[in-house]
C-alpha cells in the first residue's frame, strides 16, 4: 500500500464520495468532530470502530470514550475511522489504494502513534485485521519487528480482553479492563503521558521495543504478547490423535509482573461520562445517546462473564446521572436516551433514578430490558417504566425450562414469567420479548419442549385480558461458553434442532419465533474457538482471516469452519477443532490464565462441580415435582433477590412519586417543511418553516427541547455547507441567521420558525444554481432534527423535502432542474399533462431507499418535490450534495443516455414512440428483443445506445451551470 498524503485522500474523496453507499461516513465535518493542529499535539491516536453496523454504534460507546479521553487534553489527539458499512464501499477504498485514515485529519493510519480498537466479540477482530491490511501495516507483530518504529502501536481492548489468545499474534498491546482516568488509579491518559515522554526522548521511533518494555514493566494492565511465551504438550484424550494442550507460560521480560490484572474504575462518580459526540449526519437517531448508570452485575449467572469479571457492581449516583442526561441534551439537542440494559436493573435506586430523569430532563427513556424478579417486586416501578416511553419490554428468561434456569442460577419459574407479562399488559406494554439461551450443557428435548407450555400460558393470558394485539416474541440464541466463567470446563454442545418443532408450535399460538444469528454453524464455531483460543490457536485464526481477506457484515463465509480445521492442523492441533472443543479437566491450563480477572479458578471450579452434580441428579420430566419454590435445586448459587441490597425497591422512604403525563407511543409526524419562491429576476423570498404535528397530544415537550433542536439543526447546516462550497456564501449566512433569530414558536406537539431573505439582484442566478445542491439538505436536516422524541415514521412513509416555485421561462427552469435531477442517487418521476415533459409517468434509475422526485407545472410555474423514505434517513440527502463540476459531468452523461429526460427545450417530439424500432441517429433497425434499449436523447426522438451516448456527450456542458464550472 503506497503512502497517501492528506491532500491525496481529500482529493479522492471529493471525486468519489457521491459513488459511496454512505458518503457521510467519511466526511469528518460533523458538529462535535475533533480538529486539532497536527503538529501541535504530542500523541496521536486513531480509534477504529470495527462494528459491522451503522457507524453510530462506534460513536456512542467505547471508541467514543477513548476519543473523548484523548481529546480532553490539548496535547493529545484522537481521530476516528469506521468500518465501511457496505462491502462495496470497502472495495472502493481498496481498489483506489486508499488506506485507513482519520476522517477528520485525513492522515493515513501509519501517520499515527497508536491505532486502537474495541473488541467485544470475535467477528470484530476479523474486521480489524482487514483494516490493518488496508492500512498497509504488516498483520503480525513479528512481521513488524524489523522496523517497528515506522508503524503505529496496535492496541486492542474491550470485553474480549479476558481471553485474548485470538488477538495475540496481531496486537502489540492489549489493554485489560476499563480505560477512563480516575484520580489515583491511572488510566489511558497516564499511558499517553509515557508515550509523549518517549517521543520527546526520540526513543518512540528509534527504540520502539524498548518503549514497549518500559510500558509493560510500569502498567500491569497492559499486556504485550511478545513478552509472554506459551508452552504446549501432547496428551491422550481419547481422540484419534494426541491432543495439543497448554502446558505453561513464561515471562520473557525481567521486571514484568505476572499475572496481569484488569483495571477497574472504583467510583463511577469520579469519571466523566460521555456527554458529547460527533453528530453523525447519517444516523437516523441524530443525537440520541446512551446513559450509563452503573457497571457490573450481582446476578452471578454461571454462563455470563459480565457477572464474574466486572464485580463488584458499581453505580453512578442519581444526581450525577441526571447531570449527565442534561449535559447530553444541552450538547446534542436530543432528549432520547437509552440506558445500558444490564445497568439499570442493578441500580439500587432505579425507581428514583427513572423518576428523576423523567421529571427533570423529560427524557424519552428506553428501559426495556428488565429482570423478572425486579419487575414483579414493585407495581409502582412498572408504572414508571410505562411512562418512560417504550411500548415493549424484554425479559431475560435465559433457560428453556425451570431446570435449565436453575442450572445457570437464574431461579425463574414459569409462574414468575406469566406474572411479569400480566403486570406488563395491565401497565400498558404491548410488546414482550422473551430472551432464551438454548443448547446449555445437559439440556434435553424435554427441557426444550417446556417452553411450548409457557407459550400456551402466555397466549391464554393475552386472551383472558382481552388484548389480542399484544405481541410475544421468543428469541433464542445458542450458548457461547465464555472464558472466566464456571461453564469454561464444559464441552460446547452441538446445535439441537428440536427448536424447529418449537417454532411450529409457536406459529399456531400466534407467538413470534426468532433464532439469533449466532446459531449459524460457521459463526458459532468461530465465536467458540476464539473464547478457547491460546497463542497457537490465535495463529490459526489469524491465518484464516488473512486467507479470507474480507470483513464481516453479520455473516461468516461458508467455508470458515473447514478453513479453521485445516489451519489448526497446520499449527499442531492434529484433531482440529476437537482439540479445542473437548471437555476440560481440573488440572488443565486455559489459554488466558496469565490474566487475573479477580475470580479464582478454585471458585469457578466449585460452581462447575455442583452444576455437574445438579445435572446428574435431575431430569426434565420430573424436575418440577422434585423441587418446589423459585430456586429449585440451585441452592449452590445465591440468587439476586435473596441478597440484601439495602432497599430492593430503590426508594429510601417509599414516597409516592408524581409524574407529568408523559406517555409516549409510536406515531406518525406530519411535516410541512419549506417553500422557496423566486419573485422576479432580481430577488427571492425564502420562507423556511418547519412544523411537526404529533397526533397524540398527551406527550409533554418542553420549550427547551425545541430550542435545542432548532439551534442544532441550523448548526449542522452551517457546518456542512461551509465545508462543501466556497461560493454559496449567502446560503451559509442564511443558516447563521437561523442560529440567531427568535422568530419561532412552540407547543406541546409542534415547533415552527420562519425567515425571509432577499439577496441582492446580481446574486440571483448563483442562488438558483446552488439551491438544489445546498439548501435542500439543510432543510431536510432541519426537519429531521426537530422531530420530537417518541414520534416516528412508518417504514414506507416519506417526508417532503422541499418545494420550488419559479416564475421564469421554461428553458431556464428546465436547465436548472435537469442539473439536479441528473444524479444517479435519485429516481425521477415526471408527472405532468404537458407534452413538453412527456405524458404519464416514467421511472428511471430507482434506488430502494429513495422514494420520488417529481415535477409539476401550472402555467409557467414548475414545482419540483423530492420524497425521501424514512428508511434512507439523511443518506440520500448527502448523495445529492456531494456534487462538484466533475461529478455533474460524470452523472449527467449516463443519466441522459438512459433517457432521463424526454422531449426538447424547443418542444421537440414529446414522448417517444417506444414501438418504433429505427434509430434516428444512424437509421439502423433495432431488433425487437432490444426495444427496451431505445433511448430518448435531449434533442428529441429515439436513439440506439451508441448514438444516445454520443448525443449525451454533446449536451453535458449545457447541463452544467456556468457558476459551477
Question: Model-derived features: where do they sit?
Answer:
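Canonical Radical SAM [4Fe-4S] cluster-binding loop centered on the CxxxCxxC motif
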Residues: 59, 282-319, 643, 647-664, ...
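Short linker/helix segments within small regulatory modules
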Residues: 636-644, 930-941
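Cysteine-cluster motifs in flexible loop/terminal segments that predominantly coordinate metals
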Residues: 298-304, 584-676
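Acidic, glycine-rich segments characteristic of secretory precursors and extracytoplasmic regions
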Residues: 1-168, 203, 731-740, 805-807
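Glycine-rich beta-alpha loop elements in corrinoid/cobalamin-binding modules
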Residues: 83-251, 483-533, 541-556, 773, ...
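N-terminal pre-triad scaffold of radical SAM enzymes
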Residues: 40-51, 63, 69, 276-303, ...
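N-terminal [4Fe-4S]-dependent radical SAM core
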Residues: 9-44, 54, 222-290, 600, ...
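Conserved SAM/AdoMet-binding glycine-rich loop
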Residues: 45-54, 114, 123-124, 323-481
Amino acid at each position: 500500500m503506497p503512502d497517501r498524503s492528506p491532500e491525496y485522500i481529500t482529493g479522492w474523496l471529493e471525486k468519489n464520495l457521491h459513488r459511496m453507499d454512505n458518503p457521510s461516513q467519511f466526511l469528518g465535518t460533523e458538529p462535535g468532530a475533533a480538529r486539532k493542529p497536527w503538529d501541535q499535539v504530542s500523541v496521536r491516536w486513531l480509534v477504529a470502530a470495527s462494528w459491522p453496523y451503522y457507524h453510530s454504534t462506534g460513536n456512542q460507546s467505547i471508541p467514543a470514550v477513548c476519543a473523548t479521553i484523548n481529546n480532553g487534553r490539548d496535547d493529545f489527539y484522537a481521530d476516528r475511522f469506521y468500518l465501511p458499512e457496505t462491502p462495496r464501499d470497502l472495495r472502493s477504498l481498496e481498489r483506489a489504494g486508499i488506506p485507513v485514515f482519520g476522517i477528520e485529519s485525513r492522515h493515513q493510519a501509519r501517520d499515527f502513534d497508536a491505532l486502537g480498537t474495541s473488541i467485544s466479540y470475535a467477528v470484530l477482530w476479523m474486521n480489524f485485521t482487514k483494516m490493518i491490511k488496508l492500512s498497509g501495516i504488516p498483520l503480525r507483530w513479528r512481521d513488524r519487528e524489523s522496523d517497528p518504529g515506522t508503524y503505529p502501536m496496535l492496541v486492542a481492548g474491550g470485553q474480549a480482553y479476558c481471553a485474548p489468545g485470538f488477538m495475540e499474534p496481531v496486537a502489540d498491546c492489549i489493554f485489560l479492563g476499563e480505560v477512563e482516568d480516575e484520580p489515583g488509579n491511572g488510566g489511558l491518559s497516564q499511558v499517553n503521558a509515557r508515550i509523549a515522554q518517549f517521543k520527546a526522548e526520540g526513543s518512540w521511533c528509534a527504540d520502539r521495543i524498548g518503549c514497549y518494555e518500559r510500558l509493560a514493566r510500569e502498567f500491569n494492565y497492559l499486556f504485550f504478547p511478545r513478552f509472554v511465551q506459551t508452552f504446549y504438550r501432547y496428551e491422550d484424550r481419547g481422540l484419534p490423535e494426541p491432543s495439543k494442550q497448554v502446558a505453561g507460560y513464561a515471562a520473557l521480560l525481567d521486571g514484568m509482573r505476572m499475572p496481569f490484572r484488569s483495571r477497574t474504575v472504583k467510583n463511577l462518580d469520579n469519571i466523566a461520562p460521555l456527554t458529547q459526540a460527533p453528530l453523525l449526519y447519517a444516523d437516523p437517531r441524530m443525537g440520541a445517546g446512551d446513559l450509563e448508570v452503573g457497571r457490573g452485575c450481582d446476578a452471578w449467572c454461571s454462563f455470563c462473564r459480565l457477572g464474574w469479571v466486572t464485580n463488584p457492581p458499581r453505580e453512578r449516583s442519581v444526581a450525577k446521572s441526571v447531570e449527565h442526561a442534561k449535559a447530553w441534551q444541552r450538547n446534542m439537542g436530543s432528549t432520547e436516551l437509552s440506558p445500558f440494559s444490564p445497568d439499570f436493573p442493578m441500580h439500587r435506586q432505579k425507581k428514583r433514578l427513572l423518576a428523576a430523569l423523567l421529571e427533570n430532563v423529560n427524557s424519552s427513556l428506553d428501559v426495556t430490558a428488565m429482570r423478572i424478579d425486579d419487575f414483579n417486586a414493585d407495581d409502582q416501578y412498572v408504572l414508571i417504566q410505562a411512562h418512560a416511553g417504550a411500548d415493549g419490554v424484554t425479559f431475560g428468561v435465559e433457560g428453556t425450562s425451570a431446570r435449565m434456569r436453575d442450572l445457570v442460577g437464574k431461579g425463574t419459574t414459569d409462574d414468575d414469567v406469566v406474572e411479569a407479562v400480566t403486570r406488563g399488559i395491565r401497565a400498558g406494554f404491548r410488546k414482550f420479548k422473551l430472551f432464551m439461551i438454548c443448547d446449555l450443557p445437559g439440556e434435553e428435548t424435554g427441557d426444550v419442549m417446556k417452553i411450548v407450555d409457557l407459550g400456551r400460558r402466555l397466549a391464554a393470558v393475552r386472551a383472558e385480558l382481552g388484548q389480542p394485539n399484544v405481541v410475544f416474541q421468543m428469541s433464542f440464541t445458542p450458548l457461547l461458553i465464555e472464558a472466566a466463567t464456571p461453564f469454561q470446563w464444559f464441552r460446547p454442545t452441538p446445535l439441537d434442532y428440536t427448536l424447529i418443532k418449537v417454532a411450529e408450535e409457536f406459529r399456531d399460538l400466534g407467538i413470534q419465533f426468532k433464532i439469533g444469528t449466532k446459531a449459524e454453524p460457521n459463526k458459532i464455531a468461530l465465536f467458540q474457538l476464539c473464547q478457547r483460543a491460546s497463542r497457537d490457536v490465535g495463529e490459526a485464526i489469524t491465518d484464516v482471516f488473512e486467507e479470507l481477506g474480507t470483513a464481516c457484515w453479520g455473516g461468516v463465509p461458508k467455508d470458515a469452519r473447514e478453513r479453521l480445521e485445516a489451519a489448526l492442523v497446520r499449527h499442531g492441533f492434529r484433531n482440529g477443532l476437537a482439540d479445542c472443543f473437548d471437555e476440560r479437566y481440573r488440572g488443565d491450563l486455559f489459554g488466558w490464565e496469565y490474566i487475573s480477572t479477580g475470580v479464582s479458578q478454585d471458585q469457578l471450579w466449585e460452581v462447575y462441580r455442583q452444576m455437574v452434580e445438579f445435572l446428574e441428579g435431575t431430569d426434565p420430566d420430573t424436575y418440577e415435582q422434585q423441587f418446589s419454590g423459585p430456586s429449585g435445586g440451585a441452592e449452590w448459587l445465591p440468587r439476586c433477590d435473596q441478597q440484601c441490597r439495602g432497599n430492593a425497591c430503590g426508594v429510601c422512604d417509599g414516597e409516592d412519586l408524581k409524574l407529568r403525563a408523559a406517555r409516549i407511543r409510536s406515531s406518525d409526524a406530519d411535516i410541512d417543511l419549506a417553500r422557496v419562491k423566486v419573485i422576479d429576476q432580481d430577488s427571492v423570498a425564502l420562507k423556511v418553516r418547519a412544523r411537526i404535528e404529533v397526533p397524540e397530544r398527551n406527550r409533554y415537550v418542553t420549550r427547551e427541547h425545541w430550542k435545542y433542536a432548532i439551534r442544532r439543526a441550523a448548526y449542522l447546516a452551517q457546518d456542512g455547507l461551509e465545508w462543501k462550497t466556497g461560493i454559496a456564501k449567502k446560503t451559509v449566512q442564511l443558516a447563521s441567521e437561523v442560529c440567531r433569530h427568535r422568530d419561532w414558536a412552540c407547543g406541546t406537539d409542534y415547533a415552527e420558525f420562519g425567515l425571509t431573505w432577499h439577496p441582492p439582484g446580481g446574486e440571483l442566478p448563483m442562488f438558483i444554481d446552488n439551491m438544489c445542491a445546498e439548501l435542500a439538505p439543510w432543510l431536510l436536516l432541519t426537519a429531521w432534527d426537530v422531530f420530537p422524541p417518541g414520534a416516528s415514521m412508518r417504514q414506507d412513509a416519506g417526508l417532503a423535502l422541499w418545494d420550488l416555485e419559479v416564475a421564469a421561462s421554461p428553458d431556464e427552469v428546465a436547465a436548472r432542474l435537469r442539473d439536479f435531477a441528473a444524479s444517479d442517487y435519485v429516481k425521477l418521476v415526471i408527472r405532468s399533462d404537458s407534452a413538453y415533459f412527456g405524458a404519464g409517468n416514467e421511472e428511471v434509475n430507482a434506488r430502494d431507499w429513495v422514494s420520488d422526485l417529481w415535477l409539476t407545472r401550472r402555467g409557467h410555474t414548475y414545482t419540483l418535490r423530492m420524497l425521501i423514505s424514512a428508511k434512507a434517513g439523511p443518506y440520500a440527502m448527502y448523495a445529492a450534495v456531494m456534487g462538484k463540476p466533475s461529478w455533474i459531468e460524470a452523472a449527467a452523461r449516463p443519466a441522459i443516455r438512459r433517457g432521463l429526460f424526454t422531449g426538447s427545450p424547443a418542444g421537440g417530439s414529446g414522448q417517444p414512440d417506444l414501438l418504433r424500432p429505427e434509430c434516428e441517429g444512424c437509421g439502423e433497425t433495432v431488433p425487437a428483443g432490444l426495444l427496451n434499449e431505445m433511448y430518448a436523447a435531449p434533442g428529441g426522438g429515439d436513439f440506439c445506445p451508441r448514438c444516445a451516448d454520443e448525443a449525451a456527450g454533446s449536451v453535458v456542458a449545457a447541463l452544467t451551470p456556468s457558476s459551477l464550472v
